Amino acid sequence: MKIVFMGTPDFAVPSFRKLIEEHEVKAVLTQPDKPKGRGKKLAYSPVKEEALKYDIPVYQPTKLKDDKEIIEKLKEINPDFIIVVAFGQILTKEVLDIPKYGCINLHASLLPMYRGAAPLNWVIIKGEKKSGNTTMLMDVGLDTGDMLLKEEVEIHEDMTTGELHDILMISGGELLLKTIEGLCSGSIKPVKQEGETFYAKMLDKELAHINWTEDAYDIHNLVRGLNPWPIAYTEYKGERMKLYKTKVLYKEVSNKPGTIIEVNKEGVKVACGKNVLIIEKVQFPNGKPLTIEQYINGHSIEKDIILGE
């Protein structure tokens, strides 16, 4: 099958490789090169780097909907499918109508739940027990197209967004291959998205600031959901303290929320609006992430200090 692939970050690369192995990828569309690092040198997207290894033509529209030259090129290619994995741009009807079998999107949630830009984060922040990938036939809406195939994964109580990302990143490629095969054979029938939904909006930095009046369970989910980025944080004696790993102690205490009630090598116990949060791994300014056992070897964390003040 002739395929045009549209994708940008690491998440899209394994799917791209699978398509190269099984089909004829005629072109790649990815986001423009962006300044990176202290030197602000232009850096290629992970998908562009991969495409160049295979000498596949790469196009980088700032806004595809306004780029008539690239749209005409897509029409010349006349692909059977356009496959989209975390491309980062909305496709117009003109582009959606180009491929013979349609545009397929791999979305990292069990649609219709968690449409939007940050499904991996929000599914964990909300404390869900399962997630997965969904393939869908794209329409002009945002993640609203007819569903094709789904694949579920369990979310264990300590799983981070980074860990879920890596699982779904690898499994997504196989799901795309099955979807292409099923559409070509007629064995897959598109299903309308109906029922409850939740929009997984882009993350903002304010979300990362911990509110200790909340239940420790919800704070734990926030910590997991914001790891590896942007990382949930609080303040200890005026210094920013980032939380990388926590667990919940289901125990009622009378201390003011945010109060450190115990410190040992297993962790820092903090009173919350409900239950107790045990902080197991932290990072302070100019330091690297350390377990509490590592950190208290050379530094002190004092009992009775109130975090966030």
From Swiss-Prot:
Q: Cite the EC number.
A: 2.1.2.9
Molecular function per GO? methionyl-tRNA formyltransferase activity
Enzyme class label: transferase
Pfam families, per database record: Formyl_trans_C, Formyl_trans_N
PROSITE patterns, per database record: GART (PS00373)
| Residues holding (6S)-5,6,7,8-tetrahydrofolate | S109, L110, L111, P112
Q: Which PANTHER family match?
A: METHIONYL-TRNA FORMYLTRANSFERASE, METHIONYL-TRNA FORMYLTRANSFERASE, MITOCHONDRIAL
Q: Which family does it belong to?
A: Belongs to the Fmt family.
Its biological function?
A: Attaches a formyl group to the free amino group of methionyl-tRNA(fMet). The formyl group appears to play a dual role in the initiator identity of N-formylmethionyl-tRNA by promoting its recognition by IF2 and preventing the misappropriation of this tRNA by the elongation apparatus.
The protein's name in its UniProt record: Methionyl-tRNA formyltransferase
- Gene that produces this protein: fmt
